[in-house]
Amino acid sequence: MEMLRRNLKRQASRSLSAFAVSSPRAGAVAAADADQENLHPNLAAASPPMSPAAKNSSAAPGASPRSSKPVPTSAAPPSKAAAEGEQASAPANEAPAVKVVVRVRPTVSRPVDGKDLFFVRKTSPCSVAVGDRSFAVDGFLDDRASQADAFDLIGVPMIESALAGFNSSLVCYGQSGTGKTYTMFGALAAMVDSSSDHADRGVVPRVFQNLFAQIQGRQESSPEKQTSYQCRCSFLEVHNEQINDLLDPSQRNLQIRENAGNGIHVENLTDEYVSTVEDVNQILMKGLSNRKVGTTSMNLKSSRSHVIFSCVIEAWSKGFSNGFSSSRTSRITFVDLAGPDNDELDGGNKHCTREERYVKKSLSKLGKLVNILSEAPETQKDDSPHKQSCLTHVLKDTLGGNSRVTFLCSISSEHRCRTTTLSTLRFGERAKLMSNKAVVNEISEDDVNGLSDQIRQLKDELIRTKSGDTEPCKNGYFSAQNARESLHNLRVSLNRSLILPHIEVDSEEEMDVDEEDVQELRDQIRKLHSSSEDTFDDFMDAESGDDTPCSKGNPKTSEEDDQPVIDDCEDPIQEEHEVLSSTKVDQDLVSDRKSFLSVSASPHLSPMQDPTLCSSPKIHNKARKSITSPGLSPSKLSVSDCPGDEVSRKSAVRSSLQSSKLSPTDSLAASLQRGLHIMEYHEQNQGPRKSFVGLSFDHFALNPRQSVAKVSSGVLASPERKGATSSALCSSCKKAIDTDGNQKDNINAEKQIVIATSVVPEVKDDITASTIASKRQTELEALCEEQADKIKELSNLVDQYKKCSEDAQNSDGTEPTKELVDEAKVGEQHGELNVNDREELLSEIQRLKDQLKQQAGESTNVSLLEHLRNGSTDQEYELDREREKWMESESKWICLTEELRVDLESNRMLAEKTEMELSNEKKCTAELDDALQRAIYGHARIIEHYAELQEMYNDLLERHRRVMEGISEVKRAAAKAGRKGCGTAFAAALAAELSTVRIDREKERAQLKEQNRRLRIQLRDTAEAVHAAGELLVRLREAEEASTQEKERSAAMQQENDKLKKQLEKMKKKHEMEMETMKHFLADSRLPESALGGFYRQESEDVPEYNNHATSTCDDDQSWRAAFTSAYE
């Protein structure tokens, strides 16, 4: 290898720059020393023999044969600028499907007969002229263009198209010796030393160097998706209408296969996976060393076969955000066609070899195919023009198929090659008229979904077939047409060897999406929502429609408790104003509850179960239906009068400060927890990102409520003020006060915490609340001072009356005597009371006894707030303390809400972070699995390759052993023969042994041929059997469909016959009924014989004057009557 590298460097040092004009000496040295077909064309071309005169003139001193260097036409601008202009005018996504580029090789000979060597000129950026003939092209590279210019014009668009998913091809066409192979592959020295930027590198090495660089850049600069690339290369040649594998010379005469899945491919062609430029260079050097070359008049080492170098680029991309994956497959094809030789120099003396005939034949077929494809589609007669030769068949996608193709027409500017140059340009002009249909070779999620639907249909058809259902589906997959297509694919794929299976990048779990599971999940969610809506409706109906009283002593209170919760603060004020319209003080005190803890229900409340209603310490000492679950019965909701029901009341109400074991903060925290769940549910369902909890504690002024006993005592103690307070403190009004108080407590009990939809204007509420609070505080203080005096007087009277009542119950005397004693005591202390007042006091005392007995069984577990309402309003400091207590509770609740919100946000952020880490871990795991799968696959291929090498090594070792044994036997035979006189005998013995071996090999070959023939016969019989079975299956399917159609037709005819029979039966029945009706009518209209006889005699008497004519008339009448007599009878 080191010696080869030195020789190649030595040759490269003697060569000139790419396509530069060489001197005669350099041309002579190159013609003598060049032994590589892909060297510089100036060096590889052989100069024509010079005449002696020319030799003398060149040898003369001072003679400079190249002193006057031919100058090309000025119409040709610098090729680099032209290449940049052409590249900018045709972007990758909008590039034309077919392009033609012309490259001119510089001349290596001198003018002959004064003719101009540079007869090719560029007239415009899109046309080239040869004499007076103009040709349309897409690019032009003159004799001064370098390999880098050719790559910029040809290679860069091919790379962009390949990475975009299009198939791209480069076809080099031209005369032998015009530099096609040099333009395509460059010099071998540049391939060996791939690390340096060699000027002689061809288009193919430059393309792959740029391709791998762009692939690496795309993988590093795509954070939103993961992209993996894989490249595999193959190298073949078409020699004498046979396809040979250049990477494995033992693979010869390969066959071309075509199917719907893989398209056009060569059977058993070697594919090598590449990842660097060095891998590609190794493949190129190995393939080019096995290529068929020969000597022509234009080139010492001319290509005598067409070579095709293909690279398949597979790209898999998977997005991180949506998880969708897609795959792209593109193919880059480089075609180096062998050029025809110029016959003008040798004329009839040139010997047309077999290789030359095949080259010309294949190029002729290629020209005919281009002519056919350049015509209009309606004028094309041949349906399969590509199958005329192996070259056109392999290039089916390149020529008129799914590919973007660039034709590089290599021409010579010498006048002796004028005819071949015109032929090459005409070929390029016709090729430019072809219409290729290049599409992006991509498999996306939609294709996978379509295949999933097809698989589902196939499964349904298979299940239907297994179940015995012979009725075919109208839109099923197993129809007669699809069966015919399947049979055709079976025939095409018969006798075909197995192809290496494609590597699945993504697993089935990632790609397969079951639509049935998704639909089932949607149905479950929909049922859950509907059940939640039904539960919510039932809950509201049970709350608003239940009429079970909650207290036996207050029936009116139970009716008012069944009313729905009032969110607005003005409606309860209006109701209280209607109930207590007679007392102005009570109206003012009722207005103190204008603001209480309530949050209006959101109109966008989600269809799920409502949160449990929050209970307030202001609630009355009884249960509420609105704060319990809908499943509780009315018996559980009602409050028992005995103290033993305290446990059930605690579990149902969770309200009163004394009856509940929880503090106000814990009670509110338990209620807020459900509300926070609702807030999180709204945020997850694309609701407002931030919800507001409205907690209104504007005023907590307590309504002073007096007990029934103390109110009654107030009436007795102050008879002079009865007119001022009798309307509010009488027996009937007392019930109204109790009812209203219960209603107010129930209103306060309905304090709820629900999600609010908007922010309440807090500034306005604070100003209004402060104004109302100051006003009510003044009124409350005046009322407290007024009531303080009453309480002091009434308390003494109540104590005395209680003692009297106790003495009356314990004494054995009569009731009137004790009442008189009580009256005497009262008269002593209050002498101003008269007799009427005493009677009224006695009646009030009796009523108080009854009420005391009734209240004795009630629960004494009354909250501090209830005590304050029932008579402790005289103590102003207790009112202030209660207000401060609730303000502190409010601040604690607000702080607790904020803390819960902060904790919720932190927990949500932690959950999102954890979910992100989990997704990253899953992605890393998937990447590792993919890498492991690829590594396993590559290791398997390495093991298989190693096993093949081991088998080959064992075979070679066995052959070597046999050869050494044969050599040893020959040596022994020679030793036995001696030195003199035995040479003839030894030769005869050796010839006999060789003939014996030859005979054995012939026998073995004959046996193998016979075995091969039998196997072919069996294979043909098997193929025929498979064909027959497939045809039988198709015919059975068609017959089944025909029988099904006939059954349907017969069923339709049977139905029609049944309808006709039913109609006939109906007509028969109708006819019979009509006949019966007619007979009935005839029977009703029958006349007696006497009537008929009288009528006959009357007619005979009326006509006596007629003789003959009358007689005939009478006979006719008689016959007529005789005919109808039977009908009348």
Swiss-Prot record:
Return the GO cellular component terms, semicolon-separated: cytoplasm; kinesin complex; microtubule
Q: Which domain of life is it from?
A: Eukaryota
Could you mention a single GO BP entry for this protein?
A: microtubule-based movement
What protein am I looking at? Kinesin-like protein KIN-12C
**Is the keyword Cell inner membrane in the record?**
no
Question: In which residues is ATP bound?
Answer: 174-181
Renumbered to this chain, the Acidic residues biased-composition regions fall at 534-546
Molecular function terms in GO for this entry?
A: ATP binding; ATP hydrolysis activity; microtubule binding; microtubule motor activity
Name the source organism. Oryza sativa subsp. japonica (Rice)
Show the ranges annotated as biased composition (Basic residues).
1-12
Q: What is stated as this protein's family in its record?
A: Belongs to the TRAFAC class myosin-kinesin ATPase superfamily. Kinesin family. KIN-12 subfamily.
